[in-house]
Amino acid sequence: TACIATLFATLDEAPVGIRIQDVRIPYSAIPMAALGIGALGSFPLDALWHQAYGLDVTLWSPTHLMMVGGGGLATIATWLMLVEGRPAGRATLLGRGIVALALGAILVGLSCFEGEFDFGVPQFQVIYFPVLIAAAAGFALVLARAALGPWGAIKALVAYLIVRGSVALIVWGALHHTFPRFPLYLASAVVVEAVAAWLGTGNRLRYALVSGVGIATVGIAGELAWVKLSGWGDLPANDARIFLVVPAAGIAAAVLGGALSKPIRAQRAVPALAAGLAGLVLAGTLLALLPRHVGNVNATIRLTPVGDQAIVGVELQPADAASHATAFGVVSWQGGGRVSAKLNEVGPGRYVTDRPVPITGDWKTMVGLQRADEVMAAPVYFRADPEIDAPAIPALPQRQAAFVRNTTLLLREQHPGPAWPGVLGYGGLATAALVWSALFAFVAHRLSGAGAEPLVPQPVRPAQAPDSALRDTLPQQDSLAPPRGRPSL
């Protein structure tokens, strides 16, 4: 994409980006190229990772995050290309539709990082889920409303729902895999529209801060209701940390979305210092939730057969081990879908599933328990997997089991290896993230005109136009309105 943009900018002699003799490189092509290079560079690192540690069936290994990040964040570079190459004149219906689709694609791209939770068998702290939802909504919807004007957040949301819904139907209906659930972002979009209607978007920092607060409260409450209504599972509403990390992520991401809207006309852009602090807060929030520990918990697991399934009874030692759990239940997967069952307390430390779960065939079934940063599991049934030398864990009428780190069961393909491939993998991810972030900031700055000459000559103000003092009192245009002079798209 970066090469194609450079080719046409050169052929058209477009007044964009960097000029090297007769070659014109759009500013937006630079992060697009960096994203592609980072994603492609992750493939040999991923092969090395697998050779050193075995297969890692998770979205969130460092090499997989480089792949997903390169593709998902390319949607941001695509929007920057539309801004840089926008035609002069007022945008047509088609042009605004393309921009709305691009901004909806940003929400899709950022939601890719939630894929670890989309299929209902996550390996990380479940509190990440509302944090990622708040961050994606804060960044994409705040940017969309600033770029598209009134109803911009709703337009981007509609584009997102069309794309995500279509993909989910293909995965489930055509490919016959587990239906991937996804957040709706409806409450968040309504919040952003309401804030913009109330405060306007001219003061981008104020608009972003208030929108972020609304997303982290009303928006996440809406997602809690959606998750509950759809039977997806439970968000960790009983985890006190949610009142700190979700607002931190939502507000920080909203400020970053407001900062990226710098090329769009505003009375006051987000200060660079505020954007930098927001980036540090968001990164710190995501990194703070990475640790996964194991508590001293044991269980007696009893099965009551129901056909080829079973009701699972779990007796915990100590009895109060799940009294403050952020997630606790039984989940089955890999047998042709996903089955989850709640564990209802029937006595001190004794729990029974609310439905039978599979314990035969290709299914894998385990009891999951999370308590803040403790992410644990105990096996119920796992078939043998001779390809990776993993023995069967049969479905016994009664089993004594100690809870272990959940990846011990979820990633039975993994094995120990040397440290240096891990250093390369995590180092590559950190380098890519820093370079990509810096390039996005650079391009947004250049396209704003703060560090570059205007892309096209500014039109002469008509004689009947209001004088500067009066003009400064008029409301600033709240949407993407390029300079006049060339035909519209």
Model-predicted segments: where are they?
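Membrane-interface interhelical loops and short amphipathic "cap" helices
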Residues: T1, L45-L65, F113-I133, R164-H177, ...
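Hydrophobic cores of alpha-helical transmembrane segments in multi-pass inner/ER membrane proteins
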Residues: T1-A9, L65-L82, P130-A147, P183-W198, ...
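Membrane-interface helix-loop-helix junctions at boundaries between adjacent transmembrane segments
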Residues: I18-A34, L40-L101, G115-V121
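Aromatic-anchored segments of alpha-helical transmembrane domains
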Residues: G38-P44, A105-E114, A159-W172, G214-L224, ...
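Membrane-interfacial entry segments at the cytosolic side of transmembrane helices
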Residues: A91-I98, R204-L209, I264-L277
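Internal/C-terminal transmembrane anchor helices
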Residues: Q267-R292, L489
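N-terminal soluble domains immediately following signal/targeting peptides that reside
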Residues: L289-G451
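Cytoplasmic C-terminal tails of single-pass
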Residues: A450-L489
